[in-house]
Amino acid sequence: MPPKAAEKKPTTGGKAPAGKAPAEKKEAGKKTAAAASGDKKKRGKTRKETYSSYIYKVLKQVHPDTGISTRAMSILNSFVNDIFERVATEASKLAAYNKKSTISSREIQTSVRLILPGELAKHAVSEGTKAVTKYSSSAK
């Protein structure tokens, strides 16, 4: 269907007229200067929470003389987020199956056993149990 007469655009070859471009830049500059002077509330920088510092601390405990690249840190951070997401989803399903509204350490432990394979699950469960015991004894 051909465009209506009111919808036709001027044929300038896709470019704006030369006289308008500098004026638009000046106006944009004025807007940013006005925002910087305090007319509007300044928006704070959004914080991105990562596990980078914790991964780095563990790396230094295991291999004190080894470094890690930014890309490798990003991959490990994605890995940790993925595992936590899987465990949380599985624990949520387990709580729903048992008609409970609270995820406890028992659901977390069961979901870890279901998600992680064999020996890895055993080590994860023992480390988790150790961490919960340590926390419980220090909280008193």
Curated annotation (Swiss-Prot):
Keywords: Acetylation, Chromosome, DNA-binding, Isopeptide bond, Nucleosome core, Nucleus, Ubl conjugation. It is found in: Nucleus; Chromosome. The keyword S-adenosyl-L-methionine does not apply. Signal peptide: none annotated. InterPro entries: Histone-fold, Histone_H2A/H2B/H3, Histone_H2B, HISTONE_H2B_site. Core component of nucleosome. Nucleosomes wrap and compact DNA into chromatin, limiting DNA accessibility to the cellular machineries which require DNA as a template. Histones thereby play a central role in transcription regulation, DNA repair, DNA replication and chromosomal stability. DNA accessibility is regulated via a complex set of post-translational modifications of histones, also called histone code, and nucleosome remodeling. There is a cross-link at K134 (Glycyl lysine isopeptide (Lys-Gly) (interchain with G-Cter in ubiquitin)). Residues 1-48 are annotated as: Disordered. Residues 1-10 have a biased composition (Basic and acidic residues). This is Histone H2B. Monoubiquitinated by the ubc2-bre1 complex to form H2BK123ub1. H2BK123ub1 gives a specific tag for epigenetic transcriptional activation and is also prerequisite for H3K4me and H3K79me formation. H2BK123ub1 also modulates the formation of double-strand breaks during meiosis and is a prerequisite for DNA-damage checkpoint activation. Acetylated by gcn5 to form H2BK11ac and H2BK16ac. H2BK16ac can also be formed by esa1. Acetylation of N-terminal lysines and particularly formation of H2BK11acK16ac has a positive effect on transcription. GO terms for molecular function: DNA binding; protein heterodimerization activity; structural constituent of chromatin. The keyword Thylakoid does not apply. Belongs to the histone H2B family. The nucleosome is a histone octamer containing two molecules each of H2A, H2B, H3 and H4 assembled in one H3-H4 heterotetramer and two H2A-H2B heterodimers. The octamer wraps approximately 147 bp of DNA. The modification N6-acetyllysine is found at K8, K9, K15, K25. Its main location: nucleus. Pfam families: Histone (PF00125). There is a cross-link at K8, K9, K25, K26 (Glycyl lysine isopeptide (Lys-Gly) (interchain with G-Cter in SUMO)). One of its GO terms (cellular component) is nucleosome. Residues 11-21 have a biased composition (Low complexity).
